Regions:
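Sec-dependent N-terminal signal peptides
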Residues: 4-12
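C-terminal segment of classical bacterial N-terminal signal peptides
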Residues: 13-17
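Acidic, histidine-bearing metal-coordination/catalytic regions of metal-dependent phosphoesterases
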Residues: 19-164, 185-186
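Active-site beta-strand/loop signature of hydrolases that rely on acidic residues for catalysis
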Residues: 58, 190-202
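Active-site metal-binding loops of divalent metal-dependent hydrolases
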Residues: 166-169, 197-199
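Active-site environment of divalent metal-dependent phosphoester hydrolases
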Residues: 171-174, 201-205
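Metal-dependent catalytic neighborhoods of phosphoester/phosphodiester hydrolases
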Residues: 203-214
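Conserved small/polar residues in nucleotide/adenosyl-binding loops
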Residues: 219-226
């Protein structure tokens, strides 16, 4: 009996020590969140009629002066990419002022601010067939993203599922990403995802935005964010 109580005390003591352990936040490599020539922050967006059209946006460095989207009906045979249609994208340079360049979550007053110029590209694929799987990729004609699949909506009313999440805000990539994975595990055929509430803590923090994109764009369903605050 004495041995049992000794072991019990040891277990509770170790549990308490483990619970008190200081959390070590992850370090990000320099320029981790900055765009380059390879497309990132790729988002599939609803268009006027999701049964016959869909829009895509993505980000690059300002060195990439133009962009293109390619699309084709997707099949198990990878030869489908040989039938892809190429659409020229609209490219815009966006100037961001007061962007956090050196990020310290625990001491925000120490953050340093800079101005950034990034290029954003957008393309709308039209004339698609309802309830059909397509593959698409985006790039500048030489440097491309991977091929990403989506399915157009039914033309008539039909049941569908979607994910609704809110207030990502804190520990976005390191912890909130679990929610996205679990959501798609429970609803693997979700047609889209709605983000409500506070997506990040600081609208001018490039690191937080990149965390958000990295966390939720593990999946490429249409991702409306109109309900965010």
């Amino acid at each position: 009996m004495r041995t049992f109580f000794s072991l019990l005390i040891l277990v509770f003591t170790l549990t308490d020590i483990s619970a008190q352990r200081k959390y070590v936040k992850p370090e990000f490599v320099k320029n981790w969140s900055k765009p380059g020539k390879h497309p990132d922050h790729i988002v599939l967006n609803f268009s006027e009629d999701p049964a016959t059209s869909i829009s895509v946006t993505w980000r690059t460095s300002k060195d990439v002066k133009s962009g293109y989207g390619e699309i084709a009906k997707a099949h198990a045979n990878p030869a489908f990419i040989s039938r892809a249609e190429t659409i020229e994208a609209i490219t815009e340079t966006i100037n961001y002022s007061n962007v956090v360049s050196e990020y310290d979550r625990d001491n925000p007053k120490s953050n340093k601010f800079i101005t950034l110029n990034h290029n954003y590209h957008s393309v709308t694929f039209k004339g698609l067939e309802p309830n059909t799987v397509y593959g698409y990729r985006v790039g500048d004609g030489e440097i491309w993203s991977e091929w990403i699949q989506f399915k157009t909506a039914h033309k008539e009313n039909a049941p569908f599922s979607f994910l609704y999440v809110g207030d990502a805000q804190n520990y976005i990539l390191e912890l909130w990403s679990r929610l996205i994975r679990e959501g798609y595990r429970k609803a693997p055929d979700a047609s889209f995802i709605i983000h409500a509430g506070d997506l990040i803590n600081d609208a001018h923090d490039e690191h937080q935005w990149h965390e958000w994109f990295m966390a939720c764009l593990l999946y490429t369903s249409p991702s409306p964010r109109d309900l965010s605050t």
